[in-house]
Curated annotation (Swiss-Prot):
Keywords: ATP-binding, Cytoplasm, DNA damage, DNA excision, DNA repair, Excision nuclease, Helicase, Hydrolase, Nucleotide-binding, SOS response. The gene is uvrB. Forms a heterotetramer with UvrA during the search for lesions. Interacts with UvrC in an incision complex. SUPFAM superfamilies: C-terminal UvrC-binding domain of UvrB, P-loop containing nucleoside triphosphate hydrolases. This is UvrABC system protein B. GO terms for cellular component: cytoplasm; excinuclease repair complex. It is found in: Cytoplasm. It comes from the Bacteria. It comes from Bacillus velezensis (strain DSM 23117 / BGSC 10A6 / LMG 26770 / FZB42) (Bacillus amyloliquefaciens subsp. plantarum). Residues 430-596 form the Helicase C-terminal domain. ATP binds at residues 39-46. Residues 26-181 form the Helicase ATP-binding domain. GO terms for biological process: nucleotide-excision repair; SOS response.
Amino acid sequence: MKDRFELVSKYQPQGDQPQAIEKLVKGIQEGRKHQTLMGATGTGKTFTVSNLIKEVNKPTLVIAHNKTLAGQLYSEFKEFFPNNAVEYFVSYYDYYQPEAYVPQTDTFIEKDASINDEIDKLRHSATSSLFERRDVIIIASVSCIYGLGSPEEYREMVVSLRPEMEIERNELLRKLVDIQYARNDIDFQRGTFRVRGDVVEIFPASRDEHCIRVEFFGDEIERIREVDALTGEILGDRDHVAIFPASHFVTRAEKMEKAILNIEQELEERLKVMHENGKLLEAQRLEQRTRYDLEMMREMGFCSGIENYSRHLTLRPPGSTPYTLLDYFPDDFMIVVDESHVTIPQVRGMFNGDQARKQVLVDHGFRLPSALDNRPLRFEEFEKHMHNIVYVSATPGPYEIEHTPEMIEQIIRPTGLLDPLIDVRPIEGQIDDLIGEIQARIERNERVLVTTLTKKMSEDLTDYLKEIGIKVNYLHSEIKTLERIEIIRDLRLGKHDVLIGINLLREGLDIPEVSLVAILDADKEGFLRSERSLIQTIGRAARNAEGRVIMYADKITNSMEIAINETKRRREQQERFNEIHGITPQTINKEIRDVIRATQAAEDKEEYKTKAAPKLAKMTKKERQKVVEQMEHEMKEAARALDFERAAELRDLLLELKAEG
């Protein structure tokens, strides 16, 4: 069993990183439950966390607050740990409409979902890695606190095969069917097996290219080989192979029988209550739906929406904590919460939203009350899994502050860059003043970010600046991911000099060319002008040696004062460090291709945008088809190379091209 983390990097910890790594490692060794790494923008927090993982050598769960960020972290950790198991566990739905009922209009919305096969494969790869080795890092979104099948059941139902093992061919086939593998001799894909005489080929649920060939001689396994599923090329012999279930909700036959009896009993009790309350229509609906599901479970071993019966399948009492990915980890694992000021409130809010929707379904006869137990964890249940947890944020939230009296700071950037200087100027005449500042930046070939409070103000300001000949663009929430990347790219290339937006805090806006961030109406207290938002926004100018922030305000609010003082404190510390070590701040030199680290498709996508999209209208049907086919091929190649962000970019672009065509 491989159990050591091996960090591969041409860099050594620099600046503040060595002391941060040392303190974090010491905290874990001393058994500290909560620690917070308060790292300023651009100080290399991911590298610090990678060093921590290497030193403490524990299986690690890294939680991010959205798929894009999770994908970005996955790419980074994969680079740092190429010889260890770096896995990706996010929701496998490309599109998900949960089942819901609107009583006012008597409208039932069926569950509708499009499952991403690639992500499903990665989820299986993540859970199977946890049972096979200890050097595992799983990058997950909040989907890791949602219900999953029992880890004990999942582990017990693994089919373990070795050469010279005595097992009848038909018994192996039965075992594979029990763990949700389907026999398919024609369309051989993930989660299926095929039989050719004495040879059984199994396509594991956690793979997408290699399958396992088991060769029998009578009732004995003669040889086990790993084979390329597409070409049939033999890749090598195996001494042992473990086939993990094709579903996380697998149940042994005897448990399934017991679960069916329990579901029937709950159904009878529920129908009795409904009849007593005169809910005849709801009772009929519930009976019809549940009996159909039970029939499917008896005959097939599963049914659509089987997760709603997960409490019965795992034989847990009502109200008990569901199994989640966290239960698949060994007891001594470590949790890292990235951008914790956003992620922790997200984890906290999941349970209530889920219960509100399901309660309506239960009340109107679409589900049994036990469906309420198929849910995300309550926050206090999540807390029980915290043995060693590290929160990572430039602006920790109240929960982290409360639980970690002493913050571990990482303020010094390896590049020597300082936090920007801040000017506060009056609101009167702010636009004329801003135009003067923009002109000065344009002359030096630098860029400007402007953040406003309302959509209308953003639009009006954009129009006004365009009228006076400034190259400006406007970033708002309705812009698709693809266009967003293109706008940021154009800003870096100099097609625009100014970018205006309301919320410029979203990931991917760390642009080295930006030397000025202007905050309009900085004294209007609220979500976008809170101390946290202000510090994060100020950080956008910290990638440039000339970085400066101008706040337009008539009074200095409490949030402004905290943000200004914190930035000043950090800057003084950084200047002191640079002076002692003789460092001259250097603007980060980042390839334009790398606009958003999570989406390395920017380069290729730009090519398609310029070559394919404008000419699409003039193309013949055949030519258009050729472009689409080429992109589909590239998308699959990217997915195969585990470059999911690029694959997602190409997929979105494909959809746009198909819609236009």
